[in-house]
Amino acid sequence: MTVLETKRGAGAERRHPRSPLRKKTKYRKADAASAWLLLAPALVLFIVFIIIPTIVSLGLSFYQWDFFDTPAFVGFANFAKLATDSAAWNSLGVTLLFVLLGVIPTIAIGFMLAVLINANMPGVGVLRVLYFVPVVLSVAVSAVLWAFIYDSRQGPIGALLRVFGLPPVDILNTDTLALPALVIMMIWLALPIVIILYLAGLQRVPEDIYAAAALDGAGPWRTLWSITWPNVASTTFVVAILQIVNYVASSLDVSLIMTNGGPLGATTALSLYAYRQAFSNQDVGYASVLSVVQMVIIVAIIGLGRLITRRFSR
Amino acid sequence: MRPARLRIGRYSTIILLGLIIAFPMLYLLSGSLMSFSDIAQYPPRLFPTTPIWENFAQAWSYLTPRTILNTFAFVGSVLLIQLAICLPAGFALSKIKFRGSKVVFGLFLVPVLLPTNLLLIPTFVVTLQLGLIGNFFGLVLPIAGQASVGVLLFRQFFSTLPDGLIDAARIDGANWFRTFYSIALPLARPIIAAYSVVTFLTAWNLYIWPLLAAPGEQTRVLTLALAPLATTQFSNISPSVGFAAAVIAMVPVLVVFVVFQKWFTRGIAGTGLE
């Protein structure tokens, strides 16, 4: 799927699977003991902090619990609560808005920019740094920066509005503007990684395809759309999954720091709503239900995407 | 003649769009040296009239050296633990044939679809039950335990080493630990570098887990100190000082990124599968 994976992975697969040599190998007890010893440290931490929480999350959704008292089994009551909780449905809408507004522009812009800087010209290697550099910013650092950019009194956008004699707009406190403003920052933050992944994907497109297309008289846009884009489909799939997860789950950091879910819940996505239910309302069971819902959404979107891409590639 | 003109057009597009993308960050650097009147000036200035280094002194005392040390300790511990657990595990899964290896491999695939923010609440529950909330172990261990990407990446790498190399060492009488340590590990340097850079960056920038697990003065990391500046910088301190604090928090990652850029892009491309 990626440079490392395919270059090395493909070779490795060819070398061993189901060769006669392998069938002859018997499991040796001494080997097994060594293997488990080498695995043990990773397994212990992984089971305690990933596998058990996953199971706990599913289990707790059937309990009423406040972190401290004994959990009380309530069956499907938490799920029933979800059905009538309009705030939860609003936050589900916010989550979907994050995904809808964020994912496609991130992919489209990232792809175009990667194609642009995938040029074999002297000096481009250095110029690429300009495109990669936002990757070093944490959400916290970029929040400090973008909160200033969006600030109505001191920020550049406010200044621009004043030039045209327009009234100041407090972007992050306007319910229709806050979410798009956060999404713009998230796109900016996500671009370096998307560009890097696409650059890796573009390296694997064989040069002679382009030569053939040029011979057939295809212009640059036609080449881009009919040759380059289909040839990086596997990268697009990976990028899409990463970005869906990014906008469903990582919007939590962004809205927690920049808008605290406001104004009027306009940026309270499911992730933040679940967070509040757990850590402000101490309703751990219900928060677990909301986490399960997010899990289902991610799996459903990815499954749907896979189904669509399969249909189109056949 | 035509290709030359096209080339110039492409160069200028690359430079122009690159500057647009990097602009907010360049402005952050420039703004961190502006005086209050510079940054509030209208129309906005691109460069400070005279650099005010005092901003950094103020930002430094706002952030406190303790917080900076905490961040290094947190990131360093996460990185060392991850390397110490993921490398041997990846080796065992790729080179040793034993019953159960497929099950273990499958187990490490589970979290590939589970973003860590979704496991936040149950991870907090488990860490709380272990009595680790509020201290350094609770901060580090759950993040270090996110080992699946590392294990899968190293497994992938070790499986590209020729079996003959491993067999030769085994026939010479080296046990698995020695084979791992003196044959496989030195060859893994490039992939270790790539994984380390990505892990360093990710851990340095974490916000929510440190907020939940260890928000106290003694254990607080840089992102926790910075976040309030995004909403209160305009009342408490000058935006320039906020910018300076952001720059201080950014410098270590920026250095790592610039020095190890090659490894970083390889690391992203390599872990991108997950």
Which residue stretches match the model-derived regions?
Chain A
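A structural signal for multi-pass alpha-helical bundles of membrane permease subunits
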Residues: 31-314
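Short, Lys/Arg-rich, polar N-terminal cytosolic tail immediately upstream
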Residues: 1-30
